[in-house]
Amino acid sequence: HFAVATLPPARSPPSPAMRVLAVLTSGAVLASAIRTRRDDDPCECLNWQQVYKRNGAKCGDGHELSFVLRTGMVDWLARLMYNVEFCYNFFMRIDDNPCVNMVMDNQPGEWYNNQWCYVAKECPTATSLNTSSLLGAKICEPGKDNMLRDKTPFELREMAKEHDLSIGLLMKMAYPVEGEAKWPAVEALFRNDSAIALAAVNASTLARLHYLQSTGAGYVLDSEKGRAPFGVIKGGKTYLIEKDEVNRQE
């Protein structure tokens, strides 16, 4: 259930981010390199499955549901509404220790625009949890921690297959989710770089898209309803995330 489609040559050279359109659902690909720390480092990110099974954490004790709590939803309702999709079908399935997004948004400079993980309470940079005397939550450090944001879409697809995760949700837990340059508004540019396609995109959206492309970082270009299909850009390439027919959590 994986296909890579290379766009046909355009009459004029397309921008680097428009050269490849890959369709990602599930399948086996490259394994990712994982940064390591000493086992006795209290700031080492902990395995997600183990914090729930052995360390007494409950999903929502950390930032698992911050994406919706930030909107003003009360904690008990957030746990009730999102427990299956986000807790059981995502966090509790990850038998690894990657840092994940605090929220599904793109607000550079805001504290919640970072990635996080559970750590031992002794970690000096961790914040304490009201419901656990053993754990803390910390903001991850680029270059030091195993961050989903550093992985390629192909590596994320491998992770989705290995841990039986929704690839759509995994992408949104890895990359900032762009709110202005949304996929329905810009999709035509990646399939057809003609003047007609270009003219269909308003100037501010086009400028925003060009800026995101120039960074080389990964971003989710979300759909209007927040579900697949949507786009991902990273490193000069564009990926189409389609509804996962193998793991129907989209």
Put a short name on every predicted segment.
Residues 12-20:
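Bacterial N-terminal signal peptides that target proteins for export
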Residues 1-9:
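Low-complexity, disordered terminal segments
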Residues 37-250:
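Extracellular/cell-surface secretome signature
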Residues 19-33:
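Cleavable N-terminal signal peptides of Sec/SRP-targeted secreted and luminal proteins
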Residues 9, 13, 30-38:
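Low-complexity, Pro/Ser/Thr-rich intrinsically disordered segments
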